Amino acid sequence: MNFGNIDSDLRRKLKHIFIVIALLLPCTGVFAQYDKDVFFFRGRRALADGKYSQAIENFNVLSRIDTTDYWTFFYRGIAKYNLGDLRGAQKDFSTSVRLNPVFTSGYHYKAITESRFGNYDKALEDLQRAIDLRPGYIGLYFSRGVTYFLAQQFDKAVSDFDKYIRKEPKDPSAYLNRGASRLFLQDTTKALADYNKAIALDRFEPEGFIRRGRLYASQHKYADAISDMNMAISLDTTNTFAYFNRAIMYYEQSDYNAAMADLDRVLKDEPGNALTLYNRSLISAQVGNYADALDDMDRVININPGNVLAYYNRASFFVNMERWQDALEDYDKAIELYPDFAKAYMNRSYVESRLGLNKESKRDYDIARRKIDDYRDKTGSGEASFADTTKKYSSLLSLDADFAKKDFDDEMLQHRDVDIKLRPLFRFVLSDKRDNVQYALKNRYENPLIDKFLNGMAVPVVITNSDTVRISGTDKFMQAIYSGGGEKGVAEFQKALADVADKQFNSAQVHYDNAIDSDASDKYAKLYKVFYYMNRAVLRADMIDFISSIENNVQTLTMDDQGTTRARVKDQVSRSYDYSDAVEDMQKAVEIVGDVPYVYFNLANLQCLSSSYVDAIGNFTKAISLYPYMGDAYFNRGLVLIYLKDKEKGCIDLSHAGELGIEDAYGVIKKYCETNNGE
């Protein structure tokens, strides 16, 4: 059994309880400023409505108004927690207890966050501090019980759940968690009693039936187990975990059709669920359908290239299909991943003999015998015992909680609902109206040169990296743009902006060229060329991206020598694109004016596209030094750091980005920054 279920209980419980508790907590002190009251109310209201990013925005403002208000950091920590930003939440909860060392709720929530990182000793210390401050707050015992469970101190977990249940005897979650703890203490009788009690308290919650059904299955009471899964599914027809478990139960009853139907149902909702694909592959092979078995196992390997069982079993499919060379490659990979895999050596020996590689076959056979003998000497078991241990390599797998989700996310490199890309380049664009610079507490970037440049335009122009800037059409601007007044460089620049808005990219580049080549009539005209180079660089990069998008839509299929399409990394064709002209333009912009953060941000982005990641990090850092509230720069630098395997720093940057209003950051944090502990 995995610890994931009880943790998922906690997370689900927290989703509902975190906000309720937070909003019921007393808020002391009277704010001196009306604005502070307004932002505080808006932040708490957003929390109650589940609008966590909006809540963070309001608490950000409060944190700048008053850096000593521990409630502000506490509430912001709750919002970050619910967005998956555990590091950011941990930092805010730590700040809340630093500002108020007797803040019970701060220690409580800090402990919960620590436990998600697997820092159970620290979590238990924080919970003990909270209990010392408020021994009568019963919810602390529930949280500490969960933490003890995760720390594998099951007897202490039972003790804390006992205390909680004495005060809250009608909370089914407590019985479910105590039952799970008792299972690990091998007390199946009391565990079953707890599951029965949880079901009696809430017969409309499928989790109780799933837990009890799995317990019945472990006792080989499959009829009772399937009955409980049927009940769970009737309560929640979208509960894929119930279908998954029922499939294994049907399989144990040799009802392969029913098992396959349930696995198909899981994959309908979660088409990339690696564990379900793996199990379906094994059943397909067992009934002789090797084509479907291969399709599923290929996907498992694509999702998780380090899965030794997938290579081992796919090799056996190839053996049954007499595809000896393919089988040999997979046994090679399985042994590479698991050098002590005696059964793989034995099977590879057989494949090598079929390929006429007699010397290699004899060598592998001897290695296999030696490993079996070593195993027997260490365990005191005979070959029959060894044979039994190998059964697990070709039997269905079962896993608790979010079964295999972390693995199958890797296949797509992004969540289905989260677009993990660099934040785009900044540029000047036409707009229906000019920027409103009267942003109170919005940390707007102010640069006198940019402001003068924009104010001198004949038409509304803004600088942005968003595609949501409204422009109802360029016709209304044409007279002002082509009136012939003003400095030539600015006039050509405005014409280029109009062409870009109308998607006349070649014409736009000509106008940018003219703006850059124009004579500088005064010092400002010379400095304005930083913006001309910047926008031309962006245009050049966009044109390259457009070409690459067309070429990448043409897919290449590679066939092996037996006519079977194989999806392997080595078969994929990639092409790099030359951004050197765009990079050169951006570097010239830096040479003209060296304190515009947007230019350094754009240069860093282009360096990423050119695979110059270390240089890119330096320029993102420069952009941040010039504009510390540039969330986009934190976001992109975080992605690059994660790509370069500096995950800790990358996740800190993403947390800053989310705090600064980049909502995409929280989707990336959930994908890359949540640790294995607590998942």
Question: Language-model segments: which ranges?
Answer:
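Register position in tetratricopeptide repeats
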Residues: 48-49, 82, 116-117, 150-151, ...
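Canonical tetratricopeptide repeat
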Residues: 41, 75, 109, 143, ...
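Eukaryotic alpha-helical solenoid repeat scaffolds
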Residues: 320, 342-524, 542-581, 673-679
